[in-house]
Amino acid sequence: MPLKIRLSRGGAKKRPFYRVVVADSRMPRDGRFIERLGVFDPLKAKDSAERVVLDAEKAKEWIAKGAQPTDRVARLLDGLGVLTREAQSNPKKALPKKKAQERAAASAAAAEKAAAAAAPEA
């Protein structure tokens, strides 16, 4: 039985509220779950203690039993110090594309030429 530690949505429209639950991965998002570990309220301030209320010991037990946290729950557990996530980087996405690099090189060359022409020859 593939277990996941994931978020189950509650609350009203545009007022989300999530329960952190352990559930079979084949069950619906808000469907049957095995155990409730805590709550996550994304509308609270990020530094609020009530934003994430979670039983860390139960979470550790379920992870030891083989339950896999989803990405968002892993981030919440990392914030509480229960789990350590590996740092993710996407360096190629930040690089400018080919045409932008060509434009930057051309503008740098033009600026260099202008600086050389403006500087008095001594």
Curated annotation (Swiss-Prot):
One of its GO terms (biological process) is translation. This is Small ribosomal subunit protein bS16. It comes from Methylocella silvestris (strain DSM 15510 / CIP 108128 / LMG 27833 / NCIMB 13906 / BL2). Gene3D superfamilies: 3.30.1320.10. Pfam families: Ribosomal_S16 (PF00886). PANTHER family: 30S RIBOSOMAL PROTEIN S16, SMALL RIBOSOMAL SUBUNIT PROTEIN BS16M. Keywords: Ribonucleoprotein, Ribosomal protein. It comes from the Bacteria. Residues 87-122 are annotated as: Disordered. Residues 103-122 have a biased composition (Low complexity). The keyword Ribosomal protein applies. GO terms for cellular component: cytoplasm; small ribosomal subunit. GO terms for molecular function: structural constituent of ribosome.
